[in-house]
């Protein structure tokens, strides 16, 4: 590599400079404090671990996004975490082994071999919250409410919510006896709202099932989409009715808690279909193609770790949250410039630091001209035998 190219970073990999790094860290602390006030306990997961553990129950999408290396100590294949959620699920199932509901949260960098979407980061800072041990819609309402509280605290403007339930499609596909290949093709067509393809793929199915699967491409919009779903899916199997009723219950609770929040429903929404088992949700803002936060229910993920538990949660990219939010996270760059040496100087500097002041001490050869570059607007000066804080001379 030529010397001139040594500063280049791989596509999708970023460095964060001051003051942006300070804004991100301030947001991280505020969000984790918010999670704490809701009763969520902070956990830290490994950056890298054995691949079979990292990908257990996570699905093919995560496999494709995971950087893989060989551990020189054991010869086994390892992966850098591309999603913290499965790691936290393992903690709940294997390490904590609590009987009742467990609320956990996390924040950390992840690494993607492939970006989530065009022009997105491959090194996001993933931040999220998970609730284990309760299968009721009340848990889904709690984590969605926490997510919305987080977005409100970050002052993300004009948020609207998209909600769906993968159990609706899964129940209809099971009742229709679709082969794995046809189910995948229909899944792709529904995601693209390709009505002609949906009609072709369901042409050989019995009338009621055919009509209900086709209806999923059209059952989207405001609250009326749920009411239409009740009518057009009235003949669906019990598991589909249960899924639809769960979605309606969650929608009612959110409408009561957040009366001004725009809610959009899509009964053919299959985000995370191979991973999620129930309600799926995402928060969007105008002009941004990707969701700013997303999540859903993923029951029984802990089964591969020896203990199946209901689970629901959400995650966000902290860097995106700071970029799209309008909260005042800027920390005023100020400080006190102290000379390199002097009688009693060390004690005076430490007193100021213990009082919460930012003090930058000069290194040999530096003078007050370096103070501005160090972000200082005051100086420590010896006057009448005492060290005193004074304005920095211009």
Swiss-Prot record:
The family annotation for this protein states:
Belongs to the class-II aminoacyl-tRNA synthetase family. HisZ subfamily.
The protein's role, per its UniProt record: Required for the first step of histidine biosynthesis. May allow the feedback regulation of ATP phosphoribosyltransferase activity by histidine.
Q: Where is the signal peptide?
A: none
- CDD domains in the cross-refs: HisRS-like_core
Tell me any Pfam family this protein matches: tRNA-synt_His
* GO process terms (BP): L-histidine biosynthetic process
Biological classification of the source = Bacteria, Pseudomonadati, Pseudomonadota, Gammaproteobacteria, Pseudomonadales
Q: What is this protein called?
A: ATP phosphoribosyltransferase regulatory subunit
Q: Quaternary form?
A: Heteromultimer composed of HisG and HisZ subunits.
Miscellaneous field: This function is generally fulfilled by the C-terminal part of HisG, which is missing in some bacteria such as this one.
Give the record's GO CC terms. cytoplasm
> What organism, scientifically named, is this protein from?
Pseudomonas paraeruginosa (strain DSM 24068 / PA7)
């Amino acid at each position: 590599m030529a010397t001139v190219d040594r500063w280049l970073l791989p596509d999708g990999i970023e460095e964060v400079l001051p003051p942006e790094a300070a804004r991100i860290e301030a947001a991280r602390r505020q969000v984790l404090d918010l999670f704490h006030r809701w009763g969520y306990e902070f956990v830290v997961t490994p950056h890298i671990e054995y691949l079979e553990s990292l990908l257990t129950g996570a699905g093919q999408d995560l496999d494709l996004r995971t950087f893989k290396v060989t551990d020189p100590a054991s010869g086994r294949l390892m992966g850098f975490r591309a999603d913290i959620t499965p790691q936290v699920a393992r903690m709940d199932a294997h390490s904590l082994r609590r009987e009742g509901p467990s609320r956990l949260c996390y924040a950390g960098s992840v690494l993607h071999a492939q970006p989530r979407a065009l022009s997105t980061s491959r090194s996001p800072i993933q931040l999220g919250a998970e609730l284990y041990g309760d299968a009721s819609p009340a848990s889904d309402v709690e984590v969605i409410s926490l997510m919305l509280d987080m977005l409100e605290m970050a002052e993300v403007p004009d948020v609207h919510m998209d909600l769906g339930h993968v159990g609706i499609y899964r129940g209809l596909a099971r009742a229709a006896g679709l082969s794995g290949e046809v189910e995948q093709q229909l899944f792709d067509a529904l995601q693209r709202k390709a009505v002609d393809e949906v009609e072709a793929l369901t042409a050989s199915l019995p009338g009621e099932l055919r009509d209900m699967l086709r209806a999923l491409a059209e059952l989207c919009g405001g609250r009326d989409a749920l009411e239409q779903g009740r009518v057009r899916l009235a003949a669906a199997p019990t598991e589909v009715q249960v899924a639809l009723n769960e979605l309606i219950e969650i929608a009612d609770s959110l409408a009561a808690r957040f009366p001004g929040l725009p809610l959009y429903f899509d009964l053919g929404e299959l985000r995370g279909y191979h991973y999620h088992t129930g309600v799926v949700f995402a928060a969007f803002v105008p002009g941004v193609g990707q969701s700013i936060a997303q999540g859903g229910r993923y029951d029984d993920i802990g089964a591969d770790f020896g203990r199946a538990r209901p689970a629901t949660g959400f995650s966000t990219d902290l860097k995106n949250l700071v970029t799209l939010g309008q909260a005042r996270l800027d920390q005023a760059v100020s400080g006190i410039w102290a000379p390199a040496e002097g009688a009693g100087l060390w004690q005076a500097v430490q007193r100021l630091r213990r009082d919460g002041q930012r003090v930058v001490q000069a290194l040999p050869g530096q003078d007050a001209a370096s103070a501005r570059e160090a972000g200082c607007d005051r100086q420590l000066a010896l006057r009448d035998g005492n060290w005193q804080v004074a304005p920095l001379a211009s």
